[in-house]
Curated annotation (Swiss-Prot):
GO terms for biological process: DNA repair; DNA replication. It catalyses: NAD(+) + (deoxyribonucleotide)n-3'-hydroxyl + 5'-phospho-(deoxyribonucleotide)m = (deoxyribonucleotide)n+m + AMP + beta-nicotinamide D-nucleotide. Zn(2+) binds at residues 395, 398, 413, 418. Transmembrane segments: none annotated. HAMAP family: DNA_ligase_A (MF_01588). Gene3D superfamilies: 5' to 3' exonuclease, C-terminal subdomain, 6.20.10.30, BRCT domain, DNA ligase/mRNA capping enzyme, Helix hairpin bin, Nucleic acid-binding proteins. The gene is ligA. This is DNA ligase. Belongs to the NAD-dependent DNA ligase family. LigA subfamily. NAD(+) binds at residues 29-33, 78-79, 107, 130, 164, 278, 302.
Amino acid sequence: MKERMSELVELLNRYAHEYYTADRPSVSDSEYDRLYRELAELEEKYPTDILPDSPTHRVGGKILEGFEKYPHQYPLFSLQDAFSREELLAFDQRVRKEFPQVSYLCELKIDGLSISLTYENGILVAGATRGDGSVGENITENLKRVKDIPLTLKEPLDITVRGECYMPKASFDAVNQLRQENGEPEFANPRNAAAGTLRQLDTAVVAKRNLATFLYQEASPTQVGSQEEVLNKLADLDFSVNPTHILADSIESVWEFIEKIAEERDSLPYEIDGIVIKVNDLAVQEELGFTVKAPKWAIAYKFPAEEKEAQLLSVDWTVGRTGVVTPTANLTPVQLAGTTVSRATLHNVDYIAEKDIRQKDTVIVYKAGDIIPAVLRVVESKRVSEEALEVPSHCPSCESELVHFEDEVALRCINPLCPAQIKEGLIHFASRDAMNITGLGPAVVEKLFAQNLVKDVAGIYRLTIENLLELENFKEKSANKLYTAIQASKKNSAERLLFGLGIRHVGSKASRILLEKFHDIPRLSQASQEEIAAIDSLGTVIAQSLHTYFEQEGSQILLAELQEAGVNLDYLGQKAAADAALSGMTVVLTGKLQKLTRNQAKEKLQSLGANVSGSVSKKTDLVVAGADAGSKLAKAQELGIEIRDEDWLDSL
């Protein structure tokens, strides 16, 4: 029976590839169903002989507890956007300045969810979302239900590939029809539907929604020499690869392709929002390298956004964490790119003056980058009032006089004690990419302010459980949970703290680069502007901003208070070079941890030289198991893998 099961799996996977990926079915649906039922019956009788690539794995039926974080071995970078032909020409000039004979591979930009698939010995062992590019979510079980993703490859390869998971238009219409019949809210657009589906805890729902993929990148080291060859290799491995792409020798040919696809866009069976242009030669890609945020060898041209008319009702002015006062328009509701829009950014006071926006104007609204609603221009022929918009002279939060610096487009509150700035700064400090203090969100920050318990980020670490119990709706359990999260954040690597301080122009990636260079925040604070500006991919703007921040007495007092409170100021990655107790080991975390958050545990393991994986396999060296560990612990025991508890990790 084992041989017959293997034969059926091979046949069914081949037929599925012909149907879902190649679009060339060689057998009828009834014949496929007959073979599928035969396999299912055999697997029910002989469960120990079920093969890892059996198509029955795609049916669903498993309820997941949640999604673990998944650290990407190979980071996923976002792409620089272009919105005009001029921006594409500028990109081409930058590339050709170093490589005059370059050619470009142009691919459709699928409007879905970025995914990463990892295969070991040809078997799919992990599938994850992009997340922040460094850490995503492990959605392996859900991706196994996407019918055009191979569970096994033709060859026993160790390979990581990247692509886009999307919901075809026909599937989107069918899903929304069903939701309408069931009285459920409809998805706004196929991208939201795909993202929502992949985060379902019930894998059976994923299986029913007919998601699809296009793969386009081999993230792990490759033996081929061009992006075109990468696509051919992926297709040869039975991945679904979009056949609509061209190799262009000039930016003029790229633009012709863009114009052609723009005309055909609405007739495609899936949503796209642009064209991705990549240098074809992989060796040239490597030479060009990256900025902090994006590759220098690629750019994403975004199609012009949909535009709608709406009437301006009023304007709200809000203060951000850097003191910038931003105007937001309240509008008559309009449907825009699949969602109802009733608020849109007006950017800044200079923008209002430039566009001559007045009270009760009819305006054109669009979604900047297909995400953020913004006012584009006024429809002057429909103007009903000559009355100018009222621009505030004082801060809407602290009532300090606002300033408008000559070199800035926005109004700014420069009061360092402005409550709105401090609150926004605290929210940023506690956010996931900064200190990751679970439970310290906007509502709790508001309560802390109302009780006068916190005035700056150092005040977070002076909070006691008794303080937290003073907050409205806080019981002992919630107070203990937040207090534990605050204490755990003290052990974060210092790049999180640096990002959390909210220094202008210093993002999370720049923070990591800076701490890799200077090892701790005190040394960074003493570095000269020239030393910082000399770091590849940073430059003078970041150097000036850091110098301005650290020369302020208040900043030095804040750092001293944080250090006194026990907050770590060191870059933990340097410990790996010193003691690397787990150097080269593949470690898996499972279960609930009590002393550390999962991200902190991963950072500690990585600082000790470990590669942290989201799944257990024969290549796993060690499993750290917390409370209520489930299938991963069982699999580790079955494979004879060393198992340790959280106390062991804490002792390292």
